[in-house]
A protein has these predicted regions:
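Active-site Gly/Thr loop motif
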Residues: 293-298, 344-369
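Active-site-adjacent, His/Asp/Glu-enriched structural segments that form or flank metal-binding
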Residues: 116-181, 188-196, 202-203
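A small/polar active-site loop signature that marks catalytic segments
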Residues: 206-339
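Beta-lactamase-like hydrolase cores
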Residues: 24-82, 88-95, 159-165
Length: 369
């Protein structure tokens, strides 16, 4: 049985409107009577005797009258998935910036389009021939925009070369970045923000892949008589190593920690799935719009700019996010991968130190904005 019978989404407040930064630290500290916990966990005597769903409606009415919301824009929709109907609506058609809840839209679209078994791949290939322990040819590192690619993966590349019996390379080391376009920032991003690097070939989140590759080869005792460049892999290249990370691995960090780089990687995987090369934000938006149309809403009403929510050009509604969550709930393959990746109130991710009261801790899976 699915764990949740009710999704509470979306409470959007105009400020703050920026998506959470990719390196946001979740403070490890005692959270005493935090505002959100006390608001959600304090049930009055009157609300305890009210029938469902009137008790929920009463509580939300009281919350919206609080000082917290006097100078804020709010879009709210509460949906009972068992009854398949909305039990509360407030400005649910109001266009608002989603901030990091945009990541939920990206995640649902990605699982729907790519499937839960999708892999984020990085390959290494070579041309030429090996003779007398020398590779007379070029090596290509083909980026697939895997945000988790790290030193262990790079070591696997180097070990593959050593297993060929190669101790000298006479040729060039090429980065193949043809998977996506050359845009380094998303549309509507603030130039002075701590933005992720939109490169399909990263190592440990940094755009220094080939420099690290060359250094690690030499540190491993391989003589490299080569220069570094950028070039698309030729058709006759022979691939000797592929490293990958799974959809679930990317989703976990993307949603639990609200990681912008992981969300943008997911966004460009969506774009790449269309077959258009290079992958562009425009292609990803087209896929998201088709899904919006599929769930019965008009995609022209919304503005989708990026996958992370960093863009100030994103505008969506509470209704859209709830209807996408409904779609995810009713499609088992999406739900299976999405639900475990959402932060759990009082337990982990961006909700670890929030909603820690007895009614909410461990009982709410949600995405922060």
């Amino acid at each position: 049985m699915k764990k949740m019978s009710l999704w509470l989404l979306l409470l959007v407040i105009a400020l703050p409107i920026a998506a959470q930064t990719e390196d946001e630290n979740i403070e490890e500290k005692e959270d005493t009577a935090s505002t959100d916990s006390s608001m959600v966990d304090s049930l009055t005597r009157d609300s305890l005797v009210l029938p469902w769903p009137q008790s929920v409606q009463h509580h939300i009415d009281m919350m919206l009258k609080s000082e917290m919301f006097k100078n804020s824009q709010v879009g709210l929709m509460i949906y009972d998935l068992d009854a398949d109907s909305a039990i509360y609506r407030f400005n649910e058609h109001q266009l608002l910036r989603p901030a990091s809840t945009m990541k939920v839209i990206t995640a649902i679209t990605a699982i729907d389009k790519l499937g839960g078994s999708y892999q984020f791949k990085t390959e290494m290939c070579y041309t030429g021939e090996v003779k007398d322990r020398t590779l007379n040819g070029d090596i290509y590192c083909i980026g697939g925009f895997d945000p988790r690619f790290n030193s262990d993966d790079l070591n696997a590349f180097i070990e593959s070369i050593r297993k060929m019996g190669v101790d000298t390379i006479r040729g060039n080391l090429y980065a193949d970045k043809s998977m996506k376009d050359s845009a380094t920032m998303g549309e509507g991003w603030c130039w002075d923000d701590d933005n992720p690097v939109l490169s399909p070939l990263l190592i440990s989140r940094k755009d220094v892949f080939m420099e690290r590759f060359l250094k690690e080869l030499r540190d491993a005792g391989v003589v490299v008589e080569a220069t570094i460049g950028e070039k698309t892999k030729p058709e006759d290249a022979f691939c000797i190593c592929t490293r990958f990370h799974t959809m679930d691995q990317i989703l976990m960090k993307m949603l639990k920690e609200s990681d912008n780089l992981y969300a943008e990687s997911m966004f460009y995987q969506i774009a790449s799935s269309t077959g258009n090369r290079p992958a562009t934000a425009k292609s990803a938006r087209a896929v998201i719009k088709r899904l919006i149309n599929k769930i019965g809403l008009d995609p022209s009403r919304y503005n989708i700019a990026d996958g992370s929510g960093l863009s100030l050009y994103n505008y969506v509604t509470a209704e859209l996010e709830v209807m996408l969550l409904r779609y995810a709930y009713r499609n088992g393959n999406i739900y299976l991968h999405l639900f475990p990746a959402l932060p759990i109130a009082g337990r982990d991710g961006t909700l670890k130190n929030r909603m820690r009261g007895s009614f909410t801790s461990g009982n709410v899976n949600a995405k922060t904005g």
